[in-house]
Amino acid sequence: VLLATGRRTNAAGAAQVAALLAELDVAAIRTELPPQSMPLMGLLRIVDRDLAVGWPGAVPPEAAAALRARGFVLLEPPAGPELDVGRALNFVTLGPRRILMPDGNPATRAFLEQAGIECRSVPVDELAKAAGAVGCLTGILERCCPGME
């Protein structure tokens, strides 16, 4: 489990989560978020067992290294207004290599589709008023792990 400290999680809180995970025999990989970031999911999205999409140049190096060491490819779409203003990476993974993303991000969508990711999109005008998009409305209920069926 990637466990990040930053504006929302301090070292003491991360230590408590890491201790609980250790009791469950789950390793916590600690990393620190850049100062301008809040949740790790704002920088990094998992789209398949071996594929992640990250904010260009902002994914913490420890997180990127941990993913690559576990066989992940880390895609970084081109930086620009689609990421900053269009919230293109604020998407929801619907299934392996299938996502629901904010409308109006054609370059990012083309980049993701070229990587084999099926993209559906929806308008997020109202969500954007609260500085969010579809990813902000969701929580992960289940994530399958390699070797688990």
Q: How would you label these PLM feature ranges?
A:
Residues 1-149:
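Histidine/cysteine-enriched polar flanking segments
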